[in-house]
């Protein structure tokens, strides 16, 4: 037993469709966000490589594959061009379409990939909006209570202070 640490993810991302002045500039920002997300994912993988099994570490490889997916990138760029809109809105809309399709398949493995896309979409949107994801900082051994928790958040926790996780 130990104290509960409530991870509050109630703040929502403010994703509003906005007209943009430069499509090329918005596409450049999107591509830069992809590179930053890839670098963050590689960094997390390196931090976790000694803490996780080879099988568990493969989730980061899967995340990198999603972030490098030319179809996802192309559809997002096409969305920006055809709607003359901001990249964070385009990311949200395109990934929402992908996750809806994957969840409709009813396969638990595929649904887990849909969850990965949601997490990566959130990461990209946070990068585009120049915001940071809530980090979990434990000062004493605690039980983490959350609606959901991302692999990125898990990798930032001092494992010696985690008594359990309830989602």
Predicted regions and their residues:
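Non-catalytic, soluble scaffold/interaction modules
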Residues: 1-167
């Amino acid at each position: 037993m130990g104290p509960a640490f409530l991870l509050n993810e109630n703040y929502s991302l403010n994703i509003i469709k906005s007209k943009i002045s430069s499509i090329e500039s918005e596409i450049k920002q999107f591509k830069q966000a992809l590179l930053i997300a890839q670098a963050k994912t590689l960094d997390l993988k390196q931090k976790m490589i000694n803490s996780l099994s080879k099988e568990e570490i493969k989730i980061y490889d899967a995340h990198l594959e999603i972030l490098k997916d030319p179809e996802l990138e192309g559809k997002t760029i096409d969305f920006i061009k055809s709607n003359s809109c901001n990249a964070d809105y385009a990311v949200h809309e395109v990934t929402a379409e992908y996750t809806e399709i994957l969840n409709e398949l009813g396969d638990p493995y595929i649904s887990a990939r849909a969850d990965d896309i949601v997490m990566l979409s959130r990461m990209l949107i946070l990068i585009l909006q120049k915001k940071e994801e809530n980090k979990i900082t434990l000062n004493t051994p605690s039980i983490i209570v959350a609606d959901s928790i991302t692999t990125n958040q898990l990798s930032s926790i001092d494992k010696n202070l985690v008594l359990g996780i309830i989602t």
